[in-house]
Amino acid sequence: MTPGKHSGASARAANGGAWGYRDFRGGQKKGWCTTPQLVATMPVSPAGSHKQQNFGLNNATQPKKSISFFATMKATSVKGYTGANQSRMAVSKTVLIPPELKTVEKPNPNIKTTQVFDINGTDVTPRPLYHPDPLTGTAKPSKLLTSQEGSLGSEFISSYSLYQNTINPSTLGQFTRSVLGSSTVSKSSVSASESIAEDLEEPSYKRERLTSFTDLQVIRAAPEKIVTKEDLEKNIEIILTETETLRFFDLPTVMVSVESEEAEKVTQRNKNYEVLCRNRLGNDLYVERMMQTFNGAPKNKDVQCDKIIMEDKGIMSTAWDLYDSYNAMELVSLSVKQSVVESSSKANVLPKDQDQRLPGSTTEKNSETSSLMDIENVILAKIHEDEEDHSDAILKSDKFHQDLFFMERVLMENIFQPKLAAYRQLPVLKEPEPEEPEDVLESAKHEEVEEESKKEEEEEIHAEESTIPANLERLWSFSCDLTKGLNVSSLAWNKTNPDLLAVGYGHFGFKEQKRGLACCWSIKNPMWPERIYQSPYGVTAVDFSIGAPNLLAVGYHNGTIAIYNVRSNSNVPVLDSSESPQKHLGPVWQLQWIEQDRGTTGDGKREILVSISADGRISKWVIRKGLDCYDLMRLKRTTAASNKKGGEKEKKDEALISRQAPGMCFAFHPKDTNIYLAGTEEGHIHKCSCSYNEQYLDTYRGHKGPVYKVTWNPFCHDVFLSCSADWGVIIWQQENVKPSLSFYPATSVVYDVAWSPKSSYIFAAANENRVEIWDLHISTLDPLIVNTANPGIKFTTILFAKQTDCLLVGDSDGQVSVYELRNMPTVLETGRGDIMDTLLGSKSNQSA
């Protein structure tokens, strides 16, 4: 079939094209008829690709009528027509009618519609899927794809044929849904959903829709790139940049109130600082430079805590407690009964006529019961108050405090019984274990076996102790929370009660001064002191009186001397030298009570208090109406003896800042209390007499530093011992001004030395970091026992126990440790002084 040619065909195609019809009865292509009036031509494909076909319409069809579909629609290919491809496109479509079909148009003056009938006369007109709202106005054409109004050029036909032949349905469908569907459909037109019908009412509306299409641009999908192994191994550079700081919330801190007086000054300073920060950028006056800081290396330290002491507490209810409690309840019930009887007796006293007036009154009964309840409450409250007053009186009574005091001592003795037994050299008591009931014979045999085993164990222990060298075993320490961190400056035993110890706490250095403390400790209670005397100044010396053991003399770092009565619980001193015009101007380094003869005319002895201070004065204090002070000696600086040779001239003496030498220690002769030794800061030891206060009897030169302690030998009265800051300990003889024996065992300051009360050739020395026990009978080169201090702790004072083989050592942490001397060599009862004299006589000029 050749396509027909007619002049109206092109116009028809331009206006909207024709629309075709397929016969589904046999799947065969029907014949097509053409009319000379109207010919519809499909868009022509490129040459050689598809055949051009003409379709004719029935004569009954009205001229210039077409059906336009703007919704997305799927065109079904007709068998035998290669130009009809499947596509999804929002463009106008032409329906082709075969010649067998007849088109009949119903006359309607208002709305012109087109109906399609088959050969049998059946109406096969397609029904629209979308019914437009007649009340809605016509949609305006979109200007997105509009080229010119009222015309559709040949470019649209050519592009349409190109899409029909080359574009993939899936690609075109996506494009038409996103671009054409959204750009051409309005509220009054068809929607973007798929449809196969369109409104056929007004041709002007269709023409506006056709004129809105322009050339379509194809969006081709880029082919996916195949990723190879080389692409995976390539290095990908990712550059990270810092974004700007986003502040979600900024609340400036306010340190000064706006209403304060300093608000204006602070505001002005802030403004000046902001101006300074702004001017800093780009200013030549500011230079950036780097600084290196030193960071301390971290250290791992092990800390050992104190032993956690567990206590078992119990409550005992005795028979008299139960009796008192029950008796109190009976007293309450009796008092209530008595009140009830009294109220009833008062009611019986009333006249009979008053009782007969209100025989059945309930108000009287209620009032009587309420009054009885009130009386009971008052009685109970009064009893409770009496009990509280009674309990307060008991708790505040002196008898109760005394009972608690003794009870605490008993508990401490039970806890420290093994330690106290070792201190007093007594056997340790072991608690008997509970035994099951046995026969008498078996128990007796068992006891005999135990006694034999104990004897064997004791023999073995003695044999082992003979092989173990001498050592120090720590028993306990006098310390509490008040003394922790304070320096132990002095120790003193009570002259009458050997279980009472006075301890002074205070630092030696002027810049290290803290609060001072003087405590009286008892062996019966090592956990808490019996008396506590606090002071704002450090305590440097303490000593108990000989004639009045209850008097304790305390010297302070500010030069004050105070005397306390330890029998009283008062913390106020009985006497002090704070108001005395002769008080010391420097620290009182030593105090001692001395008994002296009253003179040739007087009988007996008198007791004086002697003190030495850093102001260069040795003073005695006499208790009369107050503390009267007299100077025994004013220590003067001495020049070293010049050893000039012949032809040498004497050098001029150096100018002295102070002509007085600070005194550090003193020691009175054990037999002749008129003679005493005084150690000075220069390193000299002066022998002085109480009868002469203008000059020294002798001067012992041997130390190169301050002399901290001088003490006489308790058995050889012509031998004394001294220690100094020059790391040395020297033994002197009274007749020889040169050292007899010198000991320099360590490179540390020796703060204190003490002779043993049981041996003339045993003494102890307290260095900064260790305690040494020397036995001159065994060796003069090495100490017999050495006990090292803990890290960071310094030993400051030392004192032997009077009646036991124990040693007390004070340190810089506020502890006074008690050590037992184990396996010491036996002490000869006779010839103590002879052995010392022989030792010093043979080695008088030997230095160790």
Swiss-Prot record:
Residues 345-370, 431-464 are annotated as: Disordered. InterPro entries: Dynein_IC (IPR050687), WD40/YVTN_repeat-like_dom_sf (IPR015943), WD40_repeat_dom_sf (IPR036322), WD40_rpt (IPR001680). GO terms for biological process: axonemal dynein complex assembly; cilium movement; hematopoietic progenitor cell differentiation. It is found in: Cytoplasm, Cytoskeleton, Flagellum axoneme; Cytoplasm, Cytoskeleton, Cilium axoneme; Dynein axonemal particle. The keyword Chloroplast does not apply. Residues 359-370 have a biased composition (Polar residues). GO terms for cellular component: axonemal dynein complex; axoneme; dynein axonemal particle; motile cilium. GO terms for molecular function: dynein heavy chain binding; dynein light chain binding. It comes from Homo sapiens (Human). Coiled coil: none annotated. Pfam families: WD40. Keywords: Cell projection, Cilium, Cytoplasm, Cytoskeleton, Flagellum, Repeat, WD repeat. PANTHER family: DYNEIN AXONEMAL INTERMEDIATE CHAIN 4, DYNEIN INTERMEDIATE CHAIN. Plays a critical role in the assembly of axonemal dynein complex, thereby playing a role in ciliary motility. WD repeats lie at residues 534-574, 583-631, 658-698, 702-742, 745-784, 790-829. Part of the multisubunit axonemal dynein complex formed at least of two heavy chains and a number of intermediate and light chains. Associated with axonemal dynein subunits such as, DNAH2, DNAI3, and DYNLT1. Interacts with DYNLT1. This is Dynein axonemal intermediate chain 4. It comes from the Eukaryota. Residues 442-456 have a biased composition (Basic and acidic residues).
